Amino acid sequence: MPFERFVQTGRIAKASAGPLKGRLVAIVDVIDQNRVLVDGPLTGVPRQEYRLNNLHLTKYRIKFPYTAPTRIVRKAWTESDLKAQWKVSPWSVKAQNICKRSSLNDFDRFKLRYAKRQRNKLLTIAFNTLKKRTKADGTPRVLKKDRRERLRAEKAKGGKKAAAKK
């Protein structure tokens, strides 16, 4: 699969360093191989030059003319409904989860650790029961408990059949 995230007019990027860290910006113009002119009218980013080393390119791109003014960038941004698309993207969800994790206090971390321990205990029990029920070659093993239940069920059915015949 070829590379598809090019530095181009309309490409949406996420600032990774500096005062704009975490904000989305649109590339308006490429100044040189290291710098671009960015604008983020709906994310509170004024039009300014920004280093490419401090940007992460996203898969999103909005259509507007080369070196368009801020009002046209704003219009294209709102028409593309970029905010909603970004909120459901895995990248955004992961960033929000990292933010939530970093804001946990000591008691929240304890509750999380306790819940994980409980979940893992349930998973281990379920795995071990399945492991007991299978042989080394992968075929299901009939346990004594299963055999007893099956015999009881057959007796119950046999009793009904015998009663029906009489």
From Swiss-Prot:
One of its GO terms (cellular component) is cytosolic large ribosomal subunit. Gene3D superfamilies: 2.30.30.30, 6.10.250.2270. It holds the Pfam family Ribosomal_L14e. It comes from the Eukaryota. One of its GO terms (molecular function) is RNA binding. The keyword Ribonucleoprotein applies. Keywords: Ribonucleoprotein, Ribosomal protein. GO terms for biological process: cytoplasmic translation; negative regulation of neuron apoptotic process; ribosomal large subunit biogenesis. Signal peptide: none annotated. Residues 135-166 are annotated as: Disordered. Residues 146-157 have a biased composition (Basic and acidic residues). SUPFAM superfamilies: Translation proteins SH3-like domain (SSF50104). Belongs to the eukaryotic ribosomal protein eL14 family. This is Large ribosomal subunit protein eL14. The gene is RpL14.
